[in-house]
Regions:
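Alpha-helix N-cap and loop-to-helix initiation/capping positions
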Residues: 113, 117, 206-209, 250-254
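Short, aliphatic-rich beta-strand segments
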Residues: 69, 234-245
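ATP-dependent adenylation/nucleotidyltransferase module used to activate substrates
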Residues: 3-181, 239, 258-269, 277-288
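Auxiliary Fe-S-binding modules of radical SAM enzymes
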Residues: 215, 222-224, 230-233, 245-288
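Mid-to-C-terminal catalytic subdomains of enzymes
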Residues: 166-172, 176-231, 275
Length: 288
């Protein structure tokens, strides 16, 4: 079954507001996770390359050793930089890593890009992992992820996937503090980076060529502008690029000319640069 209730898409971090006094120390977090993992079976951590799943994989590798595996799924929707980050950490810290094909591009329901596309993405991910192992699957979802529309969590529940950070009510801020305390310097401050398909407006078919174009433009703007937040959106009206305020101020002249030329070279209409708006490619169905 797939979720039908519409809602606002959670594309990026929406952090639970907690006072400094309410945040647990990294030592307390590691202790709580160690206690949870004492009774855990062998585990397969679904690792996307973001701060949450990378931190969870590091904790599991430290606590469980050979009983923990990291599973990373590749597809046109996964930025190559995320895959390289996972591979590098596995080499550096001795993680047991298996890289698999996500398979969602073979799913017509996913390719149709409905409002609950994430359900079909996670359904394919967890089913592919299950083809390789019978271990308990862990995801890096954190407590902040429960406050919005997350159809991927429905697919996880249907497949008995566990979320240790959710079980221990660990917030995004606590995950980042935990990553810092463990020396995961490349990931501790990573901005939210949803899959590339999130850049495509609901109802527009997901195409690998579109996602490769999105990744190219975003990578170039990060390098050229030092942009902390950049989203290349493909919509019915054309391509618009959303930037953080500082980057937006420097996006004219040669920067705009380059992006416009790349759009024209691939037969795309460039709409322009606009301020970043979370989840703006998501079109929610009307609710009676």
């Amino acid at each position: 079954m797939s979720p039908q209730a519409p809602g606002k898409q959670q594309e990026d971090d929406v952090a639970t507001v907690r006072t400094p006094e309410e945040l647990r120390t990294p030592e307390q977090l590691r202790g709580a996770l160690a206690t949870l993992l004492e009774s855990a079976p062998d585990v397969a951590v679904a690792v996307s390359g973001g701060v949450d799943s990378m931190t969870l994989a590091a904790v599991c590798a430290r606590e469980l050793g050979a009983r923990a595996w990291a599973y990373h799924a590749v597809s046109p929707a996964v930025p190559p930089a995320a895959t390289e980050r996972v591979r590098e950490y596995a080499r550096r810290y001795g993680w047991q890593l298996r890289v698999i094909e996500a398979g969602e591009f073979d799913d017509p329901e996913y390719r149709a890009n409905p409002f609950n596309r994430c359900y079909f993405c996670k359904r394919n991910l967890y089913d592919r992992i299950a083809e390789h192992t019978t271990m308990q699957v862990f995801s890096g979802a954190n407590a902040d992820d429960l406050g919005d529309f997350r159809p991927g969590l429905v697919a996880a529940a249907e497949r008995a996937v566990r979320h240790p950070f959710v079980e221990l009510n660990i917030s995004k801020a606590e995950v980042r503090a935990l990553a810092q305390s463990m020396g995961l310097v490349e990931v501790q401050d990573l901005p939210a980076m949803p899959c590339l398909s999130s850049r495509v407006e609901s109802g527009i078919r997901i195409e690998a060529a579109d996602l490769a174009f999105v990744n190219e433009i975003e990578d170039w703007l990060r390098e050229s502008l030092g942009a902390s937040t950049v989203r290349c959106r493909i919509g019915h009206a054309g391509v618009r690029v959303e930037l953080d305020d500082q980057s937006l101020a420097g996006s004219g002249g040669d920067i705009e000319a380059h992006v416009r030329a790349r759009c024209e070279a691939s037969d795309r209409q460039f709409v322009g640069f606009v301020p970043y708006a979370r989840g703006s490619a998501f079109l929610r169905p009307e609710v009676a």
